[in-house]
C-alpha cells in the first residue's frame, strides 16, 4: 500500500485523484489533504476517505472543519495556513505527495516535501517554472523522484523510460490550441470569460483553462520540460495537435520518435504517477483507433499567442525572469476572471512586467527573492487597475 497526501484536493486534479484512489483496490491510502476554503467539499472528502490530517489555508474555514469533526466524533487533525500545508506535505507516514495547488502557493510545501524525502507527483507547474533550479537540485540531493502529472510531461517521462537522456535530441510538446485555435489577434477582442473557459478537449480548473486559451499554459510547460528533462530550450518544439490524442513525443539522436497516445483523461497521468513504477488496470475509457479519423499537427502562431513566445524568452533568460512572467500572468488571469480587464490585456501586462522588472533579475535565485519578487509583480499588476 502506498500512502499519500494531496495538496489542493478540492480542485480539478485533486478530485480526479480521489477517483483514482477509489478505484485502486486499497493500494492507495489517503493520509493528508489540503484545500483553500472549500469547506463543504472538504467535509464530503472527510466522510468518504477519512484522512488523518486536513489542512485549510483559510484559518476561519479550518475552524469550521474542526467544529464539524468535533461534533461528529472525528479524530481528524485539522491544521491551517502555510504551516499546515507544509506539515501535511512532509508527514512521516506518507510515501508520496500529489501537489495540485494552483500557482506560486505550491512552491514552499513542495520544497518541504522534498526535504522530508517524499516523492512528488507534480501537477503544480509553477513550482518548476519559478524555482526549477532549486527544486531539481533539492530533489537530487534527497534522492527524490519528481513524477510529472501534466499529461504532456507524463507522456515524455514514459517515452524516455529505459533510454539515456544523453540520446535525447528533441522534445515535442503537443498543445490542443485551446478554444481560439486558428484565430488572429484581431479576432481576440471582446473575448468573454465564458468563451475563454470553453476548452474543446480537457476538463480543467478556471486558471489553467485561461492559460490554455492564451497558450501560456504551454509556455509554462516548456519551462517545466527544460528542468524535468535537462533539455535546452532550442530543443523543445511546440506543435498544435487539436485531437489531443498524442500527448507528447521524444525524438532521439538516431531520428526515431517515440510518442505516448491515449484518451484525453487526466486520471491516466495521475494514476501513472501515483503508482509509479507499476502500471495498474485502466479506470478510464481506452483509445479506439477505429474512431480516430485523423491526427493533425500545426505550427503555433507566436505572433497572435504572444504568451508562448514570452515564456520561451523568460525561460532562456532564466534566473528570476520566469518569476516575473508567472507572477504577472497569475495576477492578470485573476483580473480577467473577475472581468476587470480584457482578454488581450493579459498579453500586454505580462510583457510590460517583464520589461519593467528587468533589473530585479540581477538578484540571485533564492526562495526569499522569488517570493518577494512574486509579491511585488502581483501588487504592481493589481495597482495598474
From Swiss-Prot:
Binding locations of 1-deoxy-D-xylulose 5-phosphate: 125, 151-152, 176, 199, 212, 217-218, 221
Entry similarity comment: Belongs to the DXR family.
Short name of any one Pfam family annotated for the protein: DXPR_C
UniProt cross-references to InterPro entries, sorted A to Z: DXP_reductoisomerase, DXP_reductoisomerase_C, DXP_reductoisomerase_N, DXPR_C, DXPR_C_sf, NAD(P)-bd_dom_sf
Catalytic activity: 2-C-methyl-D-erythritol 4-phosphate + NADP(+) = 1-deoxy-D-xylulose 5-phosphate + NADPH + H(+)
Gene Ontology BP term (one): isopentenyl diphosphate biosynthetic process, methylerythritol 4-phosphate pathway involved in terpenoid biosynthetic process
Biological function: Catalyzes the NADPH-dependent rearrangement and reduction of 1-deoxy-D-xylulose-5-phosphate (DXP) to 2-C-methyl-D-erythritol 4-phosphate (MEP).
Name of the gene: dxr
Co-factor(s): Mg(2+); Mn(2+)
A GO term, aspect molecular function: manganese ion binding
E.C. no: 1.1.1.267
Amino-acid positions noted as binding Mn(2+) in the UniProt annotation, renumbered to this chain: 150, 152, 221
UniProt-annotated binding residues for NADPH: 10-13, 124, 126, 205
Protein name listed in UniProt: 1-deoxy-D-xylulose 5-phosphate reductoisomerase
Amino acid at each position: 500500500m502506498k500512502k499519500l497526501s494531496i495538496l489542493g484536493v478540492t480542485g480539478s486534479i485533486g478530485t480526479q485523484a480521489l477517483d483514482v484512489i477509489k478505484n485502486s483496490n486499497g493500494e492507495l491510502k489517503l493520509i493528508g489533504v489540503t484545500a483553500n476554503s472549500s469547506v463543504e467539499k472538504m467535509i464530503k472528502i472527510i466522510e468518504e476517505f477519512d484522512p488523518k490530517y486536513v489542512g485549510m489555508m483559510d484559518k476561519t474555514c479550518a475552524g469550521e472543519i474542526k467544529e464539524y469533526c468535533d461534533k461528529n466524533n472525528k479524530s481528524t487533525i485539522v491544521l491551517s495556513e502555510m504551516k499546515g500545508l507544509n506539515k501535511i506535505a512532509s508527514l512521516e507516514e506518507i510515501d508520496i505527495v500529489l501537489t495540485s495547488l494552483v500557482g506560486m502557493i505550491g512552491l514552499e510545501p513542495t520544497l518541504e516535501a522534498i526535504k522530508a524525502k517524499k516523492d512528488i507527483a507534480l501537477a503544480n507547474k509553477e513550482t518548476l517554472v519559478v524555482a526549477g533550479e532549486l527544486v531539481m537540485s533539492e530533489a537530487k540531493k534527497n534522492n527524490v523522484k519528481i513524477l510529472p502529472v501534466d499529461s504532456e510531461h507524463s507522456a515524455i517521462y514514459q517515452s524516455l523510460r529505459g533510454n539515456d537522456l544523453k540520446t535525447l535530441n528533441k522534445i515535442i510538446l503537443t498543445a490542443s490550441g485551446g478554444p481560439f485555435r486558428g484565430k488572429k489577434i484581431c479576432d481576440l477582442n471582446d473575448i468573454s470569460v465564458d468563451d475563454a473557459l470553453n476548452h474543446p478537449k480537457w476538463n480543467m480548473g478556471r486558471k489553467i483553462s485561461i492559460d490554455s486559451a492564451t497558450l501560456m499554459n504551454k509556455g509554462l510547460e516548456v519551462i517545466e520540460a527544460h528542468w524535468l528533462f535537462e533539455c535546452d530550450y532550442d530543443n523543445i518544439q511546440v506543435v498544435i495537435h487539436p485531437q489531443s490524442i498524442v500527448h507528447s513525443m521524444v525524438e532521439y539522436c538516431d531520428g526515431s520518435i517515440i510518442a505516448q497516445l491515449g484518451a484525453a483523461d487526466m486520471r491516466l497521468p495521475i494514476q501513472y504517477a501515483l503508482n509509479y513504477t507499476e502500471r495498474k488496470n485502466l479506470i478510464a475509457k481506452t483509445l479506439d483507433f477505429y474512431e480516430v479519423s485523423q491526427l493533425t499537427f500545426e505550427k503555433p502562431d507566436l505572433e497572435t499567442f504572444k504568451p508562448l513566445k514570452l515564456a520561451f524568452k523568460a525561460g532562456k533568460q532564466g534566473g528570476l525572469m520566469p518569476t516575473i512572467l508567472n507572477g504577472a500572468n497569475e495576477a492578470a488571469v485573476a483580473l480577467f476572471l473577475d472581468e476587470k480587464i480584457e482578454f488581450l490585456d493579459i498579453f500586454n501586462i505580462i510583457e510590460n512586467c517583464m520589461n519593467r522588472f528587468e533589473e530585479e533579475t540581477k538578484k540571485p535565485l533564492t526562495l526569499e527573492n522569488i517570493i518577494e519578487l512574486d509579491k511585488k509583480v502581483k501588487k504592481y499588476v493589481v495597482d495598474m487597475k
